[in-house]
Amino acid sequence: MSSSMDHRVLALAGVAQALQQVRRIAETGHSEAATVRTAVDSVFRVDAATPEGVYGSSADVAPGLRLLHNYFTNQGKDDMLPRLALAVLQLERRFVRDHSTVETVSKGIEAAARQAQTLGDSAHPDVLSALGALYAQTISHLRPKVMVQGNPHYLGQAGVVAEIRALLLAAVRSAVLWRQMGGSLWDFLFAKRAMIEAVARALR
């Protein structure tokens, strides 16, 4: 994979699969450990030059690529997911322009990365709690506010809320990468075919 569109769809897949886990946790209280770990690891790989470097490989965002394929072919089963994704892509614009918030988030990520290294697990509950608190103290105050709906029983649990916020932070990180790779909301109008073809290549 080398074209900018190939890179963009990998980053967009990162957004999609992080948000799918947000939806899953909000509804069921449970997540897929491997997908959560990929999302959290992407937050810590801030110096990676390519999407493959951020996620590990295209295989690690295969769930997100399948979500994109289903969206583009009108087979998506969760109407809330595209709305969440749009909110995150819009939120990314506000975030990167707020230099004070960017600096605070960067320092918080560095601290959480050290904690993950000490604990030996990037998806440890304490790490998720730290990342969730970081999101709550910073990005969650920006607009548009990402509204997560789900089962009130689970959304009332501190651990569930922390994991959701950590995944929202990961989604924003992927949105930043998408924009760095040349992504734009105009792609969905004027480059849809190129996006579909790039997703198909990534899934081969």
Swiss-Prot record:
Localization (cell): Cytoplasm; Cell inner membrane
Xref: InterPro entries: HflD, HflD-like_sf
Keywords: Cell inner membrane, Cell membrane, Cytoplasm, Membrane
Broad class of the protein's primary localization: cytoplasm
Pfam families referenced in this protein's UniProt entry, alphabetically: DUF489 (PF04356)
Recorded superkingdom: Bacteria
Disulfide bonds: none
Membrane topology recorded in Swiss-Prot or TrEMBL: Peripheral membrane protein
Coiled-coil parts of chain: none
One annotated Gene Ontology cellular component of this protein: cytoplasm
Family, as annotated: Belongs to the HflD family.
Name assigned to this protein: High frequency lysogenization protein HflD homolog
UniProt source species: Xanthomonas campestris pv. campestris (strain ATCC 33913 / DSM 3586 / NCPPB 528 / LMG 568 / P 25)
